[in-house]
Design a protein with these regions (language model features):
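Carbohydrate-active catalytic/glycan-binding domains of CAZyme proteins
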Residues: 1-349
Length: 349
């Protein structure tokens, strides 16, 4: 049965009838086809064994129906490999370098020994095979968390990333997109989790640069924030929470991973989000906020109290995660996201 609309939060099946596994992902448009890639969470069942089991990719021409292209970056059985599935492999981002004719993929990885760094791979095709060219890379000698990669019309590249638990950094990329030049700017300095901004999702419209960010509460959702600037390096002005009418302060129980513009549409941008924990939607944001604040300010008892009160699992079973794709509309130049139980591309300009 073919899909003819988006149904945010519901299980999204591929053309084979299996749940799509492309979490923390992004969408690229290449030669008339959309490619959606992301983390495969099918083996992340809550036993602490696997975090991400490889990176998968899907293709579509209508954005509703997706064909499984398999692993573009398969898991490794080598415990020393950055792609070993017990490492915390998160948020792959792929860009194309016209100069080198290479697809360049950056992946954030928290290793078993606690090191948080970046692995960089390249390939001749979006579907791979990818070759690791750099691992345990610490850009600007910083611990790098969630991020986005952006390529400007002049082909300069920019890397927006969370300097872990402190602030957001915008770093200029080298011409081959496999390193940073050393030029960078700092944004949104805050006291620590749960308020520090992470999961930056960039998009541009009418010469303005927008960043949607998340708070720092792991897989538990929190209020999003959007900011705007006239240049890639800012300065950014915070516009507030784009999710209109979200009384739960959870971004409609999701975390946005990326934003893309629909081809052939004048103003249709889609915010791609993950509902990481659909079975824990009863946990209020206030409890999550207090739990993370307790953990990161030394009040461990407060955090553990909330864990017990809501019977929270030690390891989250993100295998059941779903997707929340919603349109971004612009009201007086301010991006807004409204909830839709279902919606169609055809309903927007």
């Amino acid at each position: 049965m073919k899909n003819n609309c988006f149904k945010p939060g519901q299980v999204w099946l591929d053309t084979n009838g299996a749940p799509i596994q492309a979490h923390g992902g992004s969408v690229l448009f290449i030669n008339g086809t959309y490619y959606w890639y992301g983390e495969n969470k099918e083996k992340t069942v809550g036993d602490g064994k696997y975090w991400t089991y490889g990176i998968k990719c899907y293709s579509s021409t209508d954005l509703y129906n997706w064909q499984d292209l398999g692993f573009i970056i398969p898991p490794s059985e080598d415990e020393k490999s950055p792609l070993y599935p017990q490492n915390m492999i998160d948020r792959p981002h792929i860009v194309y370098n016209e100069k080198t004719k290479k697809f360049v993929c950056w992946i954030k990885i928290m290793y078993l020994e606690g090191i948080q760094a970046v692995t960089i791979l390249t390939a001749d095709k979006i579907t791979g095979p990818y070759t690791v060219i750099k691992e345990k890379f610490r850009p600007l000698n910083m611990d790098a968390g969630d991020f986005d990669l952006v390529i400007a019309p002049d082909k300069k590249g920019y890397y927006y990333f969370e300097k872990v638990h402190t602030e957001l950094i915008c770093a200029t990329l080298t011409d081959d997109y496999t390193d940073v030049t050393g030029e960078y700017t700092s944004h949104f300095p805050l006291e620590g989790p749960p308020f520090v901004r992470e999961a930056p999702a960039y998009f541009t419209k009418d010469g303005k640069h927008y960043l949607i960010t998340s708070g720092t509460t792991g897989y538990y959702p929190n209020p999003s924030e959007i900011a705007v600037a006239s240049h890639y390096h800012g300065p950014f002005t915070v516009l507030g929470n784009p999710h209109v009418g979200d009384e739960t302060d959870t971004s409609f129980h999701s975390q946005i991973s990326s934003v893309f513009k629909v081809q052939g549409k004048k103003n249709l941008y889609i915010a791609c989000g993950d509902r990481w924990l659909p079975n824990l939607m009863h946990v209020p944001y206030k409890a999550v906020r207090d739990m993370f604040k307790g953990w990161f300010t030394g009040d461990m008892a407060k955090g553990e109290q909330i864990v017990k009160e809501y019977n929270l699992p030690k390891y989250e079973a993100t295998c059941s995660a779903t997707y929340v794709w919603l349109p971004i509309v612009f009201e007086n130049d301010k991006p807004k996201i409204y909830w839709h139980n279902s919606w169609k591309i055809e309903d927007f300009e």
